[in-house]
Amino acid sequence: MSLLKNKRQISLRQLKYGNSETRVAVTILLFVICSWSVPAQENIQFRVACWNTENLFDTRHDSLKNDYEFLPNAIRHWNYNRYKKKLSDIARVITAIGEWNPPALIGLCEVENDTVLPDLTRRSPLQELDYRYVMTDSPDLRGIDVALIYQRDLFKLLSSRSISIPVFRQHRPTRDLLHVNGLLLT
């Protein structure tokens, strides 16, 4: 930020950028021109949701992660039937969120791995909505990640990347952030 030192700098700045009245007038003029040049479009509604799925784990052990709680012989007695029920319950809630228009984009937290998302999007009632997904592979010790599922006919994924959270002293690694760029399709 520079400080203006004299009237000459002030007048040069106003010539270069215009004063506030000029900028407002140009902005309004551009808005009016753009409004006339763009044909009227109907309002298109889409829904966005974010959900902590609270330990969406499969029933297999990942030797690189601490997922022992969610195995068939572990303390939670996590088995295939409970896993399938959880997938079904999540699918039911997702479709209910949108009433007749299920969410176009859904951010999911606490997803274990790249196995549970195909089970959720392709082997559950969500398969009819043609959801696709992108997810992180975080250094979290329990193996939980974040993901975005999206309806392919409503959203075009352009790019995605994981953003690591710095680990501070006396803290353990945690889930990465998921940064996604895309286009809403009309």
Q: What kind of feature is each model-predicted range?
A:
Residues 1, 58, 97, 183-185:
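Short regulatory "switch" loops immediately downstream of catalytic or recognition motifs
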Residues 1-43:
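Bacterial Sec-dependent N-terminal signal peptides
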Residues 5-7, 16, 65, 84-86, ...:
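Context-gated lysine
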Residues 10, 15-18, 69, 81, ...:
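Compositionally biased, intrinsically disordered low-complexity regions enriched in proline and serine
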Residues 18, 42-45, 66-72, 162, ...:
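Short charge-dense sequence patches
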Residues 38-130, 134-144:
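N-terminal, active-site-proximal structural segment of metallo-dependent hydrolase catalytic domains
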Residues 111-186:
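Structured beta-strand-rich core segments of catalytic domains in phosphoester-bond hydrolases
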